[in-house]
Amino acid sequence: MFPMVTEFMNYGQQTVRAARYIGQGFMITLSHANRLPVTIQYPYEKLITSERFRGRIHFEFDKCIACEVCVRVCPIDLPVVDWKLETDIRKKRLLNYSIDFGICIFCGNCVEYCPTNCLSMTEEYELSTYDRHELNYNQIALGRLPMSIIDDYTIRTILNLPEIKI
């Protein structure tokens, strides 16, 4: 008779423990009900990226001295720097500068080690195209300002999502 009573007590303890675990899970679910939604309507609303975000590289042609430091520090030797030596002034003159963003790993080494600060990272991350050859940006495409600076009126940036009224 005693084994039957102990089994019944164990069953009761297990039932109480299971109910407690279900209650804890339900409390976690209820705590998430008060939070703001994480999703946004992407093409029309965009979250503001952090200031350390590594997006598309912006290039200023006039500042570049064609030292090729960006090529040496790049782990995949990506930037293509074409220059010509001016013999009369004994300086390099930059002819072309290009980066293929289809291969770029956005490590930021080129920006960090550039002695003249002609390279900078922007917050632009929409680089998708249907043709991979369009991702090869030359000095003209790299010099264009990103959309966030131009201030496109059709896109609303979101710093804090609106609160839910219950």
UniProtKB/Swiss-Prot annotation:
GO annotation terms (biological process): photosynthesis, light reaction
Listed cofactors: [4Fe-4S] cluster
SUPFAM superfamilies: 4Fe-4S ferredoxins (SSF54862)
Enzyme nomenclature, EC number: 7.1.1.-
Residues reported in the UniProt entry to bind [4Fe-4S] cluster 2: 74, 104, 107, 110
GO molecular function: 4 iron, 4 sulfur cluster binding; iron ion binding; NADH dehydrogenase (ubiquinone) activity; quinone binding
Compartments (UniProt record): Plastid, Chloroplast thylakoid membrane
Cofactor note: Binds 2 [4Fe-4S] clusters per subunit.
Catalytic activity: a plastoquinone + NADH + (n+1) H(+)(in) = a plastoquinol + NAD(+) + n H(+)(out); a plastoquinone + NADPH + (n+1) H(+)(in) = a plastoquinol + NADP(+) + n H(+)(out)
NCBIfam families: ndhI, NuoI, PRK05888.1-3
Name recorded for this polypeptide: NAD(P)H-quinone oxidoreductase subunit I, chloroplastic
Organism placement in taxonomy: Eukaryota, Viridiplantae, Streptophyta, Embryophyta, Tracheophyta
Encoding gene per record: ndhI
